[in-house]
Regions:
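A contiguous, mid-protein "functional segment" used to position or interact
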Residues: 326-355
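N-terminal Rossmann-like NAD(P)+-binding domain of SDR-like oxidoreductases, especially those catalyzing
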Residues: 1-183, 227, 233, 237, ...
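Conserved C-terminal active-site "lid" loop/helix of NAD(P)H-dependent oxidoreductases
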Residues: 226, 285-329, 348
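Generic alpha-helical secondary-structure signal
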Residues: 70, 94, 101, 196, ...
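Residue-level preference for the first positions of well-ordered beta-strands
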Residues: 5, 211, 242-244
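NAD(P)-dependent short-chain dehydrogenase/reductase
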Residues: 136-140, 150-152, 158, 162-238, ...
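Residue-level signal for the nucleotide or nucleotide-sugar donor/cofactor binding architecture
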Residues: 62, 93, 101-104, 151, ...
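Conserved metal-phosphate-binding beta-hairpin within the catalytic cores
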Residues: 247
Length: 373
């Protein structure tokens, strides 16, 4: 029996780390692409390093030759292209970089496979995005909903989607896009709104932050658990024919709902007052007497600084096709469970960070006084 060999771009990210764990558990030989950097950004996969069948290689989505060489060396049977500049707001500040990685990077992967004559033996999964729907024309969105990208990130991802489809039809390659709706976890980057909320709730509950500032509280999103979504990525490549699939829960929530639930799991109940830019989240009650000093205080406020130049306000995915054709369950982890997982993790993180800070302060003081040398 031939061995399953997976090559993952974006292996150090949220999805890459979960996918690596998933594939290793299935007996895959997993190869991940990392970039050379003076900063250590591998904490999400640190626990996997040294694991048999898990290998890391230096390459770059902006360097065609490095990808061609690596694909030729690894000879993968499956490629999961998860690498991206994936922050919508950043794409307005760095549109050219976003296009190079998120659009042309997909083409480089496809050509690396063709250059090594692996078109018939290597399947390719492309991580696409619900941001393709942008200024939505219908709800919920499915595989047939028209695209209306509303940011440089979404436009770049749209190229990636169409070039995958073109190579599938022109060269008979098994390449597919998974149109991922928002998927979160305790490994989510701290600049993304969900992780920003759960960290702030934990910090406010532990006296490390006074207020959380957000943008449009009415924005609607379909949030799922990243750990569940990587299973669907794999199922897409196991399907008998190459097709594109929406990966979503089919359930929608506002940013306001996410914030309310996050603070609830941190022991703080909010009430909302005002509208638009003047809306505020005020502490109505607390579960622990030690937090009683917060009652009546504003802990969530709206800031225009966090409004996007063009804001996508209504993303809601229809996962029916993935359910029927792949047998995937989009709600293995509920919205409430997801938020609780993230808050519990961040409560522990904030507490651990505080202990580490105290230890560093004490050590500095002891060194200054000559107590330790």
């Amino acid at each position: 029996m031939s061995k399953n060999i997976a090559l993952i771009t974006g292996v150090t990210g949220q999805d890459g780390s979960y996918l690596s764990e998933f594939l290793l558990a299935k007996g895959y030989e997993v190869h991940g692409i990392i970039r050379r950097s003076s900063v250590d950004y591998r904490e999400r996969i640190a626990h996997l390093e040294g694991t048999p069948n898990f290998h890391l290689h230096y390459a770059d989505m902006g360097d065609s030759m490095s990808l061609v060489k690596l694909v030729g060396k690894v000879q993968p049977t499956e490629i999961y292209n998860l690498a991206a500049q994936s922050h919508v707001q950043v794409s307005f500040d760095a549109p050219e970089f976003t296009a190079d990685v998120d659009a042309v990077g997909v083409l480089r992967i496809l050509e690396a496979v063709r250059t090594n004559h692996l078109e018939k033996t290597c399947k390719i999964y492309q991580a696409s995005t619900s941001e393709l729907y942008g200024k939505v024309e219908e709800v919920p969105q499915n595989e047939n909903t028209p695209f209306h990208p509303y940011s440089p990130y979404a436009v770049a991802k749209l190229y990636g989607f169409w070039i995958i489809k073109e190579y599938r039809e022109a060269y008979d390659m098994f390449c597919c896009s998974g149109i991922l709706f928002n998927h979160e976890s305790e490994r989510r980057g701290e600049t993304f709104v969900t992780r920003k909320i759960t960290l702030a709730a934990a910090r406010i509950a532990q006296g490390k932050q006074d207020c959380l500032y957000l943008g449009n509280l009415d924005s609607l999103r379909d949030w799922g658990y990243a750990k569940d979504y990587v299973e669907c990525m794999w199922l897409i490549l196991q399907h008998k024919t190459p097709e594109d699939f929406v990966i979503a829960t089919g359930v929608q929530h506002t940013v306001r709902e996410f914030a309310s639930l996050a603070f609830h799991y941190a022991g703080i109940e909010l009430r909302w007052e005002g509208q638009g830019i003047d809306e505020k989240g005020i502490v109505a009650s607390v579960s622990n007497p030690s937090l009683s000093h917060l009652i009546g205080k504003t802990v969530v406020a709206v800031s225009e600084a966090f409004y996007r130049p063009t804001d996508v306000v209504n993303l809601w995915g229809d996962p029916t096709k993935a359910q029927n054709k792949l047998g995937w369950n989009p709600q293995t982890t509920s919205f409430e469970q997801l938020v609780q997982i993230m808050v519990n993790h961040d409560m522990q993180k904030v507490a651990a960070d505080h202990v580490a800070s105290v230890m560093r302060t004490n050590l500095a003081e002891y060194l200054e006084k000559g107590i330790v040398k």
